[in-house]
Amino acid sequence: MCMDKLGTYLSDHLSGSIVAIDLARRRASSQGNDEFGADLRRFAAEVERDQRTLRNVIASLDASPSMIKELMASGTAWVDSLRSAINLPGAPNLVRDLELLIIGVRGKELLWKALAEIGIETDPPIRELQDRATAQLESLDVLHNLAVEKEFGSGRAPSS
C-alpha cells in the first residue's frame, strides 16, 4: 500500500469535511429553525462524527493530516462566508450550497468504498459509514428539491 498517496487522499477528504461542516453550520444558522436549519444542524453533527473517524484512520496509519490543506479549507470557508455576509454578486444561495454538500457526501461515499477495497477497518464499521452517507444524500436531495421550489418557484417555465 502506498502510504504517501493514501495519506494525501485522506487529507484531501479531511479538508473537504472542514469546508462541509462550516458550510452546513453557516447555512443552518442563516435558516434558523425551519426544516432546512434543523436538518443541516443534524447533518453537520454527523459530518463531525465522520471527520473524527477519518482522523482516527489517519492516525492509525501513522499519517498526519496536512495542516496546509486544513488551513486552505478553513480559508475557503471563510471567503465563502464573507461573500455571503456582504452580499456580493454571485453570493451563495441555498440551492448551490446544498449541491456542494451533495457533491461532498458523494465523495465521502467513494472514500468509504475505497477504504473497504484496500482493507482499512474503521470504528464505526465502514458499512455503517456507507449507510450514513446514503441517508445523508437522501436527506440532502429532499432539501435540495424544497430549496429549488423555495428559491426559484414551483411553476413550469412558460412555453414559447
Outline where the language-model segments fall.
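Alpha-helical bundle segments that constitute or directly flank the non-heme di-iron/ferroxidase center
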Residues: C2-Q31, L94-G119
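Residue-level recognition of alpha-helical structural elements
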Residues: L6, G32, F36, S64-I68, ...
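Short coil/turn segments at secondary-structure boundaries
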Residues: R41, A45, A59, A63, ...
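Preference for long, well-ordered alpha-helical segments
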Residues: G104-S160
